[in-house]
């Protein structure tokens, strides 16, 4: 893939930010992500999963460029080493309950449903969070969860410590000050063709694998959420037509996050003032046409706003609005070449990916945007 940049924003040291970013991140790159699933069942109803992973995506597509929103869902670098990416055990109890636990389990492994029908082919990471990267933050670590399901109604509850492999309570452990705790509750109703879901998530300050990162939020949203305990909520809905054709599936989601400053009271300084709290939001709408033009292929389009700060609460001051918004667009077509091989060309556009951070040392201009294209080839066997 390759990216380009435009706008009249200037570097603090002078010169166009777009030109400087083109020079830093504008080359065409070619990289890989490998995932190996080792699944075992002892009863035919349980699952012991080990997932191995390797990759060398360490550039702009891993969120490491000036525009972090270019990060892909598969953006991962292990230095070409093969590592354990997942290790958990899942088993049913009766007809209504499912329990999951392990030393390396991810939040979505313990959800009854993923609240979206979009996308069939994952590319830019933001569009894979059902519009709410705060609530559905995909934290991984040591954890356990339970799912209750009955007549299309589902309740999911889980806890994860992203630092659960450590024994020092200041930096690790389970349910300690340094655990990096992440707790999630999801309520959903999901018949065959549609569904709705609401979710709540609690994320602690010390979670090193929690919530926002450069690939699903603006720089300011990332900076403020890293400073304290975050409570997040999400509302999602999706619908799929009974027959493929002209009418697409529709997925929509919205998320809101409230971050309180660290308990030490030092807070974080923004625009010359110490903050007590901040609020951020995100949303998206995704349309997907299954069997578009040819059976087995898919056409997808999405628009949304990656997590952006909407208000801040300064000490000894009233709430202040922050113009941090940015629009993201995605268009892809997934060719199913064979049962095992698919090719997905995609284009993306970000209208204002650096948001409105007044303290930013990167830009001091009026506008900055980014456009790019990529081709993803997937082999499944």
What function would you assign to each model-found segment?
Residues 58-60, 104-119, 299-310:
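Surface-exposed extracellular loop regions of Gram-negative outer-membrane beta-barrel proteins
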């Amino acid at each position: 893939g390759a990216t380009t940049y435009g706008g009249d924003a200037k570097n603090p040291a002078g010169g166009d930010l777009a030109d400087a970013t083109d020079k830093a991140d504008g080359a065409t790159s070619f990289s890989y992500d490998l995932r190996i699933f080792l699944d075992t069942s002892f009863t035919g109803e349980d699952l012991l999963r080990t997932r191995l992973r390797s990759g060398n995506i360490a550039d702009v597509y891993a969120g490491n460029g000036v525009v972090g929103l270019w990060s892909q869902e598969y953006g991962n670098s292990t230095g070409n080493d093969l590592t354990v990416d997942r290790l958990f055990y899942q088993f049913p109890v009766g007809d209504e309950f499912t329990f999951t636990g392990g030393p390396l389990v991810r939040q979505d492994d313990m959800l009854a449903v993923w609240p979206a029908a979009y996308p069939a082919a994952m590319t830019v990471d933001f569009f894979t969070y059902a519009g709410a990267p705060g609530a559905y933050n995909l934290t991984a670590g040591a954890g356990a969860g339970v799912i209750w399901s009955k007549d299309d109604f589902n309740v999911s509850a889980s806890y994860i410590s992203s630092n659960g492999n450590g024994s020092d309570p200041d930096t690790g452990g389970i349910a300690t000050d340094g655990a990096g705790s992440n707790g999630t509750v999801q309520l959903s109703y999901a018949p065959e063709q549609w569904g709705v879901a609401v979710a709540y998530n609690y994320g602690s300050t010390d979670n090193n694998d929690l919530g926002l990162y450069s690939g699903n939020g603006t720089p300011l949203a990332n900076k403020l959420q890293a400073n304290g305990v975050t409570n997040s909520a999400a509302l999602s809905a999706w619908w799929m037509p009974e027959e493929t054709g002209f009418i697409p599936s529709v997925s929509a989601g919205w998320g809101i996050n409230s971050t309180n400053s660290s308990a030490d009271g030092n807070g974080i300084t923004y625009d010359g003032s110490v903050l007590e709290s901040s609020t951020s939001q995100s949303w998206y709408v995704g349309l997907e046409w299954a069997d578009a033009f040819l059976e087995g292929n898919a056409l997808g389009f999405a628009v949304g706003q990656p997590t952006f700060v909407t208000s801040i609460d300064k000490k000894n001051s009233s709430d202040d609005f922050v113009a941090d918004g940015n629009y993201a667009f995605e268009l892809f077509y997934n060719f199913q070449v064979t049962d095992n091989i698919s090719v997905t060309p995609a284009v993306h556009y970000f209208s204002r990916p650096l948001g409105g951070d007044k303290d930013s040392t990167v830009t001091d201009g009026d506008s900055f945007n980014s456009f790019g294209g990529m081709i993803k080839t997937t082999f499944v066997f």
